[in-house]
Amino acid sequence: MNHYLFSESLMEQLKTLSTSWSLPVAAVVAAIGIFATMGLFSSKNHMPVEGRTVLLTGASEGMGRSAAIQLSQKGANVILVSRNVGRLEEALVDVRAAAKNPSTQRFTYISADVSEHDYAAAVLAEAIAWNGGRSPDIVWCVAGMSTPLLWTDDGSMAAARRNMDVNYFGSAEMSRAILREWLAPENSTGPNGEPKHLVFTASMLALFAILGYGPYTPTKWALRGLADTLAMEVNYYPDNPVKVHIVYPGTIVSPGYERENQTKPDITVELEKDEPAESPDTVARRAIAGLEAGKYFVDVSFLGRLMQCGIMGGSPRNNWVLDTLMGWLIPIIYFFVLRGMNSTIVKWAREKGHPFTHPKKK
């Protein structure tokens, strides 16, 4: 079975649970997880990449760079998109060195700012020209940023607009541009054609909000709403098969994480201190495994899997039976988690004084 939960020890995954999650309930969830391994997931690779062309935004560092390298190892042709040409050139060297078939695979980069209006049309035009007149087979929107601040802090609204431009509109513009290519009548392949894949990158904060991420969290909720909408909308074009996916990473040890810590309120650090931080390579590997398993909701940790099931609403399910069972249980867990977090917040405020008096990070 091509999914990390089944290839890695379940106990290792359980170790990543926050101490706020009770062990008895985690044991019940583990039992459900074991049930899930009993033939409920297909072993088919639903997103083969060998010989296909993948375009990734945010590919010069962090998770995007790691994903590009691992896709190269699987035989993909890769187009890297990011702003910084120097980092793109460095990443391109690593991606090319990882090639499964060096004599046939092709690689390039395109410098672009995803926050700029209508950037995607020019990027795709360049990508299509480089790819012999063919659009990329897979587009993965990874580019993102986070500026944690209290909502009452100076600069929070400017940060919110900037986060929305990068995280939401950067992905929204790319998704619209590529879907106009893939779904055009002249590109119809019939319902049995090899599907294209559009991959969004959200965050576990789109499943469970935490104090201090006001400028950031709404951008990922918006992205989830767009992904849910497009997952339904592509069915309106049955002769142009497209699969939509959305990945939910947690904390990734990356340059972006270092930048977000420069403004992160101390109380936010306290609330998320038990959340494990993963390497970009680990997160990319698990995300790719989820995509290959055909998942719409792509989790990259056991905790993320639990959180998804507790807040799926009308989103497409990976597995109706398992997700429904876990969806009954997770709200009970949330009752205790939220009570613990809110208790910490109140205690912190009483000990530290009024938040307006706290020293601000520069």
Curated annotation (Swiss-Prot):
Keywords, alphabetical: Endoplasmic reticulum, Lipid metabolism, Membrane, NADP, Nucleotide-binding, Oxidoreductase, Sphingolipid metabolism, Transmembrane, Transmembrane helix
Membrane topology per record: Single-pass membrane protein
An example molecular function term from Gene Ontology annotations: NADPH binding
Residues noted as binding NADP(+) in the record, renumbered to the chain: 55, 84, 113, 176, 216, 220, 252, 254
Active site residues according to the UniProt entry: 216 (proton acceptor), 220 (lowers pka of active site tyr)
The reaction(s) this protein catalyses: sphinganine + NADP(+) = 3-oxosphinganine + NADPH + H(+)
Ranges spanned by the short sequence motif GXSXG, renumbered to the chain: 58-62
Localization in the cell: Endoplasmic reticulum membrane
E.C. number: 1.1.1.102
Transmembrane region(s): 318-338
A GO cellular-component term linked to this record: endoplasmic reticulum membrane
Biological role: Catalyzes the reduction of 3'-oxosphinganine (3-ketodihydrosphingosine/KDS) to sphinganine (dihydrosphingosine/DHS), the second step of de novo sphingolipid biosynthesis.
Similarity section: Belongs to the short-chain dehydrogenases/reductases (SDR) family.
Protein name: 3-ketodihydrosphingosine reductase gsl-3
Species of provenance: Neurospora crassa (strain ATCC 24698 / 74-OR23-1A / CBS 708.71 / DSM 1257 / FGSC 987)
